[in-house]
């Protein structure tokens, strides 16, 4: 008999304002071709589908939706329609507090980072003019139970103003095709700046050879160009679990995995997938365009 597919729901850990949009993700891994959907289908829901792909004997598919926070409710359900119907309803992460009236839930619990968060809001409160991006990272997405998911890279950038920004990916020898990656719309962060991310699907499976992929960020308003690269060698993986919120197959509650390196202490970054593995040889260079 075919094994029943595994199903994982993802949610932003940071609670949205009522007038904001929130990203939800549904990751399904199974031994047969899959057809999944988010329900209910409404005009206010924006979908992005990463097509089903087979790796190591399993089919993997990711469906991301962007929903208005004011319309978010427990009726949102990720459904496998093929080969056999299976459902998993969205559930508010425990880090959200329904006591708040202005938010769907309050801000994420910053734990030891409350001082840094307050400082960021204070020092950047009244921003005049352009602000150059200050944080740029590239990480590989993978899980210990499903190594086939190691075919994704995540690029995150934050601290810029205004919000207009351009992200692209460079491969080993050339620019990556736009069909291989998706970039989120910039969202506001404390202090009046913005942040965004881009996810790249690698065209081939990782091997023992060393390949380098680069995320290039161009912020025209501040005349700034950043790039961050990741050299991938499967033997060089160092597991570092970053902060994310995921509801797995065996549980009805979210796991809140705290980011070890504290790159973005004032927020919980939503990623298209869920467990980030930090590979060696990552570096960031800053180029100021005159």
UniProtKB/Swiss-Prot annotation:
SMART domains: IGc1. InterPro entries: Ig-like_dom, Ig-like_dom_sf, Ig-like_fold, Ig/MHC_CS, Ig_C1-set, Immune_Resp_Modulators. Residues 5-105, 133-233 form the Ig-like domain. Residues 96-111 have a biased composition (Polar residues). GO terms for cellular component: plasma membrane. It is found in: Cell membrane. It holds the Pfam family C1-set. It is a single-pass membrane protein. Disulfide bonds join 26-78. Cell lines producing IgD contain several mRNA species for Ig delta chains. In plasmacytomas, the secreted form is the major component, and the membrane-bound form is a minor component. In spleen, however, the membrane-bound form is the major component. These two forms differ in their C-terminal segments. The chain crosses the membrane at residues 262-279. Residues 89-111 are annotated as: Disordered. Residues 280-290 are cytoplasmic. The sequence of residues 1-237 is assumed to be identical with that of the secreted form. This is Ig delta chain C region membrane-bound form.
């Amino acid at each position: 008999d075919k094994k029943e597919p595994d199903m994982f729901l993802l949610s932003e850990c940071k609670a949205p304002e009522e007038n904001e949009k929130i990203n939800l993700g549904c990751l399904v891994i199974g031994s047969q071709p899959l057809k999944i959907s988010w329900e209910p289908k409404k005009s206010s829901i924006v979908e992005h589908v990463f097509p089903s792909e087979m790796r190591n004997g399993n089919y993997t598919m990711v469906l991301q939706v962007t929903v208005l926070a004011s319309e978010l409710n427990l009726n949102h359900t990720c459904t496998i329609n093929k080969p056999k119907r299976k459902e998993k309803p969205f559930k508010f992460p425990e880090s959200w507090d329904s006591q708040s009236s202005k938010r769907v839930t309050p801000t994420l619990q910053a734990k030891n980072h409350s001082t840094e968060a307050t400082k960021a809001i204070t020092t950047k409160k009244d921003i005049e003019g352009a602000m150059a991006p200050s944080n740029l990272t590239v990480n590989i997405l993978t899980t210990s139970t499903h190594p086939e998911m190691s075919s994704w890279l995540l690029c995150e950038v934050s601290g810029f103003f205004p919000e207009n920004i351009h992200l692209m990916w460079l491969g080993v020898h050339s620019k990556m095709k736009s069909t291989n990656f998706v970039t989120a719309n910039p969202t506001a962060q404390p202090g009046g700046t913005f942040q965004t991310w881009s996810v790249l699907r690698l065209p081939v499976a990782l091997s023992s050879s060393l390949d380098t992929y680069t995320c290039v960020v161009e912020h025209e308003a501040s005349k700034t160009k950043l790039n961050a690269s990741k050299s991938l060698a499967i033997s060089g993986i160092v597991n570092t679990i970053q902060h994310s919120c995921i509801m797995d197959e065996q549980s009805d509650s979210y796991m809140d995995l705290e980011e070890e390196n504290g790159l973005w202490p004032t927020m919980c970054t939503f990623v298209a997938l869920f467990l980030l593995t930090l590979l060696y040889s990552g570096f960031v260079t800053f180029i100021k365009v005159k």
